Amino acid sequence: MKNYETVIGLEVHVELATKTKIFCACSTAFGGAPNTHTCPVCTGQPGSLPVLNKQVVEYAVAVGLATDCTITQYSKFDRKNYFYPDNPQNYQISQLYLPICRNGSVEIETANGKKNVRIHEIHMEEDAGKLVHDEWEDVSIVDYNRSGVPLIEIVSEPDMRSAEEVIAYLETLRQTIQYLGASDCKLNEGSMRADVNISVREVGAKKFGTRTEMKNLNSFKAIAHAIEGERERQIELLEMGRKVVQETRRWDDNKESSHAMRSKEDAQDYRYFPEPDLVPIVVSDEWIAQIKAKQPELRPQKLARYKKEYDIPEYDAKILTESKHMADIFEAATKLCGKPKKVSNWLMVETMRLLKDNDMDADEINFSPVNLAKLVDLVDAGTINSSVAKEVFEKIFSDDIDPEQYVEENSLKSMNDEGELKATIQAVIDANPQAVEDYHNGKKKAIGALVGQTMKATKGKANPAVVNKLLMELL
């Protein structure tokens, strides 16, 4: 069998965090009743005219600046003509000839080191509606709430060679866009979607192979599976002497396989022409400077600040800043309790464990930084011990409970009264003569068994340090 390399380029669609759509005043809120966020403009009614949302341009330019793109200072919209039920106008307003941003790059890091992935362009466009297929009724219905929601499409060059590089690129893009506040980039809600273009070729070959486009990829895990699956499918075809067909394929993550949707179109198939209802966009130097001045702290700057300001190790700072949401929780909780390393420990250890156990993403954390700060203070004051704190934190993670109220209602405060504890410890000593004898015979580990029995007798509420001290005294 020949040696093949995979060549991958991405088209990443990002829904922008504007309150209204790109060409009309309809709401972009996710989750509304079907066909309630619509008007004549976004449903393509005759005589309706689009008006460009200025915030869309500003977000697009901000993303372009953050990815080292050249900003196109004279930009235009174009019509992309095609018929599909979720496209009420029978064309999409997009950008082909003069996209808003060009020639950028994103630095990624994998186990193989650092690498630059080039960005061919970033263009603005409107989203289509959402088709829902009812397999029982054998019909399809359409919700136009999403029609006209503003998108940027970030088109990479075919610079990636593995699923690992693709995921690193997507994670870096998502972090950058989230930090800018341009989008929440939630794959499960469709506010970030990636179409993956894949081809294979023999190692050392200069010419690209025939590419296929993979769709229906709504998680990083699905993207990685689809890349590996399509790579194997194409290699198998070539090894059998057959040709790879240029087509769009739909990935089914449950079956871990794909099927052909349609032949892959080229630009000429869409008969693009300049959008007649919109004037060109002129982005002046002054406007670019204003957008740049409003740019918030991005991940690289935040990472450096955490190491310096909070004296946090680089590894911890990387984990804390991977998600803007987690970074926001860390900073807010630290501001409230003034204990950055202890807040960091709860996020790095218990939060990451619970996220993994529940197959959740850091962006799905829903507890308040106020409650995390309160928990840190409770432990620091000795009000609860570490084992009780873990129990309380699990309730914070799942239900965002007030830890002070929960500890009070469930009588979880630590037993720190030495007089009260001495009686319990003496009873434990009397009930475990063998452990006492072992301790007196030099087996120091025997005290651990006595501490454990005391903790059991106090239902975990005793302070282990106090228990240890009193045991030593009584023995």
What kind of feature is each model-predicted range?
Residues 444-475:
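Short, amphipathic C-terminal "tail helix"
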Residues 281-282, 317, 329-331, 342-343, ...:
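Extended hydrophobic-aromatic, low-complexity segments
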Residues 287-294, 301, 331-338, 372-384:
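Extended, non-catalytic structural segments that build the interaction scaffolds
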Residues 1-297, 314, 335-339:
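Basic, nucleic-acid-interacting segments
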Residues 2, 311, 334-343, 381-384, ...:
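Structural motif
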Residues 189-202, 270, 307-329, 340-358, ...:
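Core structural elements
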